[in-house]
């Protein structure tokens, strides 16, 4: 007899007792054990390799019907039957246990404690746009410190940035929160969605402080490189389990790749003591989006564990195609941003290589294999800038000196797999 830990009944807190009678070299026995393992159910296995013992067992449980095969499965002392009988009630079992897509009847016990931890960490890093000081940015902008080419470069990025955060926020409210009803998960997603609203207001404040007209908020529609990005970020079909899983994967690319190209291009100015208020917005946003990517990656893994039947070679292929699509869209946007000329300290080719690097990191976070084979960060200065509070020779007003309620940590985490 062998056993794996029994699983809590998520609605009652009781252990679900699973007993599987098997024999050696039984493919369906292995399938049954694998199903319980994949969905987090513990079980006890009883081997019936002795034929006489097995026949006596069949007779004992027959109860008026012929029983001639293994596995034979019992749950809480109730005879379920064979592997096929298990598959017939598999969705019911998952639903009984609660799961990601079921309402939580009680606040505790927590069934996804990682989501509670991520939400707490995210809230400790809370900030609002009113905390920003953009006075030096205005002086840089109007005083000649920012060249005409740099201004057009920044404007092209800001044209899209606010709308990108609108798209990400809408995806939480429209695609995910209605589907994921577990309380811990909803609290996490709700926290993420609310922070996207702060991002929108922060970048809008930057636009307005620099004197950009309201027309810039819809100017992105005039550029296919921008409009195509927004359309791609919004496109999803969450009406099926398969579609919902793919939408979760895309959310990791939306926040962990599409936004990061713009982050890098704007953060480069921080290296030269320019646009330091903008640098604050970018750094705080990077911290937020890195937490969002972590949470959504873990949610994706939990989802495919609970609904493992959606995962096949075609499902994986679609995610790899998604990663290629996001890189292609970013390449076109980067070309547009650099259309007016080069930028001090950051070549277009470097940004494109970085996008491939960060996309591979996101694939790893999803449990996939790297697709672009860029193992080293092509922009090593990022770590120096993002960890600026540790460097005494950095300019005086370092953005990473900002801390609120434990807003501290290693910036390398933003780029870790």
Label for each model-derived stretch:
Residues 2-19, 96-98:
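N-terminal leader/targeting and pre-domain segments
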Residues 27, 52, 198:
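Short alpha-helical
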Residues 11-46:
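Local sequence-structure signature of Cys/Sec-based thiol-disulfide redox active-site neighborhoods
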Residues 48-67:
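Thioredoxin-like thiol-disulfide oxidoreductase module
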Residues 75-96:
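Non-catalytic, surface beta->alpha helical segment in thiol-disulfide oxidoreductase systems
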Residues 64-74, 83-84:
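Structural micro-motif
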Residues 96-417:
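Non-heme di-metal
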